Design a protein with these regions (language model features):
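Structural motif corresponding to the intra-repeat A-B loop/turn of tetratricopeptide repeats
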Residues: 304-307, 341, 375-378, 416-417, ...
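Extracytoplasmic and endomembrane cell-envelope/extracellular-matrix remodeling and assembly machinery
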Residues: 47-49, 54-56, 60, 82, ...
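Canonical positions in the second alpha-helix
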Residues: 320, 353-354, 390-391, 429, ...
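Short coil turns that delineate tetratricopeptide repeat
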Residues: 325, 359, 396-400, 417, ...
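Helix-start (N-cap) detector for alpha-helical repeat units in TPR-like alpha-solenoids
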Residues: 291, 328-329, 362-363, 399, ...
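Catalytic Zn2+-binding segment of zinc metalloproteases
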Residues: 124-140
Length: 470
């Protein structure tokens, strides 16, 4: 089930909005801003409040794509997380050394697994090369340089040199910065190709992606995909990529049919959940009897009719289950539709089956817990409590667990009469949402009633002492 994730960006992405530049430095700031549009750093500000989504099936697939690449890049061990951004434009970017952000538009527009793997390899090249840290430092230095050159230029203008002296210094710095950015992009390409070679994969997908966007460089920025603006594609860069990629012994290697099927099912699921039903039925007509097409139509059938469409949607899911009875995410889908239709009992059965087929699925475990809470019985609530605590403990995909999971945990504690633990869970929910003030209020209330020195008491003490100025 595709769910809305925590909109709060990682701590490295939280930044204050820059104030308006003064009149004297306006053009210099415009130059720096223009550079940042050409870099992945542009997304640091845009990422505030990113509409992140969570889905076990898709996250598992992307992890299978990325894990070998990250290992080859020396970034393995679960250090890097793939995060999914709900946006229909093609884009992927990094803002730190911990996360790679991929838009749903990139996932749905990529025809093959290898194309997305190539994008991930390129972004891994940026992380391994320390490009963002280097670019931040370069921008910091050159902002100072621009200011000094502008002061000197103003002096020259007063002396009779004219405004051209001011603009010339700005342009020199901008050209230098853009040259460095182009060098970083080319270096990330080459690192990405090395990672693909080390893992026995083709560079064809990366080449196809950059060829696709090369022509967009001639369009205005408003009509370009964000990926083009953050990854400038020069003709000589594509030619170099073509030369290096085609020399690999793996260039002609294709994705396996099984991996291609999983990729197509991901695209179908995203279409079903995120696009209008009419669009889905047009994209996947009834004449298409493939599993991905059936998958997309089952989702669209439910969302077109709501609870009234449940019988037809369930019938379509049951047909999918006849073809793949051990595929956990068809069972998850069955549970999702029943839960949305107020049939908690049926949802519990479906989620139990899904979890038995994928025991590490913390998201499905949370869904099962919410279905159990909907039964509103003490035994079900006690079972839900155990699932929620385990889900929070085991979820390593997000930097912080979802606020919604903590709220469900609080609900379970309240029902069982465990008010201090419930207040502690609400404090965590507010903190995960970025509402530190409310988090401190509930943390103080919880701490006053908890056993002194207990793990939860110590955690509440940490929240109370948290300094928002850090």
């Amino acid at each position: 089930m595709i769910t809305q994730g925590d909109r709060r960006p990682p701590k490295q992405m939280r930044s204050r909005r820059a104030g308006s530049p003064g009149r004297a430095c306006g053009f210099a700031w415009l130059l720096v801003s223009a550079l940042m549009v050409q870099s992945s750093l542009s997304t640091m500000v845009a990422a505030q409040g990113l509409p992140l989504i969570r889905d076990r099936e898709i996250e598992r697939l992307l992890s299978d794509y990325a894990s070998p690449i990250f290992e080859a890049a020396g970034l393995g061990g679960g250090r890097i997380t793939i995060r999914i951004v709900r946006s229909n434009v093609f884009n992927a970017f990094v803002v730190d050394g911990k996360n790679v952000y991929v838009h749903t538009g990139a996932l749905t527009q990529s025809q093959t697994p290898n194309q997305i793997i190539g994008v991930i390899a390129h972004e891994a090249g940026h992380i391994a090369g320390g490009d963002l840290a280097a670019l931040r430092e370069r921008i910091r230095r050159d902002q100072t340089k621009i200011l000094l050159m502008r002061i000197l230029g103003i002096g020259a203008a007063i002396a009779g040199g004219g405004a051209a002296a001011v603009a010339a210094g700005d342009e020199l710095v901008l050209r230098s910065l853009l040259a460095e950015r182009r060098a970083q992009e080319s270096a990330a390409d080459q690192r990405g190709l090395r990672y693909l070679n080390r893992t026995g994969q083709s560079g064809r997908g990366m080449l196809e992606t950059f060829r696709r966007f090369q022509q967009q460089e001639f369009l205005s920025a408003r009509n370009q995909d964000p990926f083009v603006r953050s990854h400038p594609v020069a003709a000589n860069r594509v030619a170099l990529l073509q030369d290096r990629a085609s020399k690999s012994p793996y260039f002609g290697k294709r994705d396996t049919p099984r991996l291609q099927l999983r990729h197509d099912m991901m695209r179908a699921k995203l279409s079903g959940y995120l696009e209008r039903p009419a669009t889905v039925f047009n994209r996947y007509p009834r004449s298409d009897n493939s599993i991905p097409a059936r998958y997309a139509r089952a989702v669209a059938t439910f969302f077109r009719g709501g609870p009234k469409g449940l019988p037809s949607a369930l019938a379509q899911i049951d047909q999918l289950l006849k073809m793949q009875p051990k595929y956990p995410y068809f069972w998850e889908l069955r549970g999702d539709f029943q839960m949305r239709s107020g049939r908690a009992g049926g949802a519990v059965k479906a989620f139990r089956k899904a979890l038995s087929l994928d025991p590490k699925a913390t998201l499905i475990r949370s869904q099962l817990a919410n279905a159990l809470l909907a039964l509103n019985t003490k035994p079900a609530t006690e079972e839900a409590l155990g699932h929620l605590k385990r889900s929070i403990r085991d979820d390593r995909v997000a930097e912080d667990p979802k606020p919604g999971t903590y709220r469900s945990l609080a609900n379970a504690y309240y029902r069982l009469g465990r008010r201090p633990e419930a207040d502690a869970a609400i404090a965590e929910a507010h903190f995960a949402s970025g509402n530190v003030t409310q988090a401190k209020i509930f943390a103080k209330r919880a701490k006053a009633a908890l056993k002194r020195g207990s793990p939860t008491w110590r955690r509440m003490d940490e929240l109370i002492a948290f300094n928002t100025e850090k």
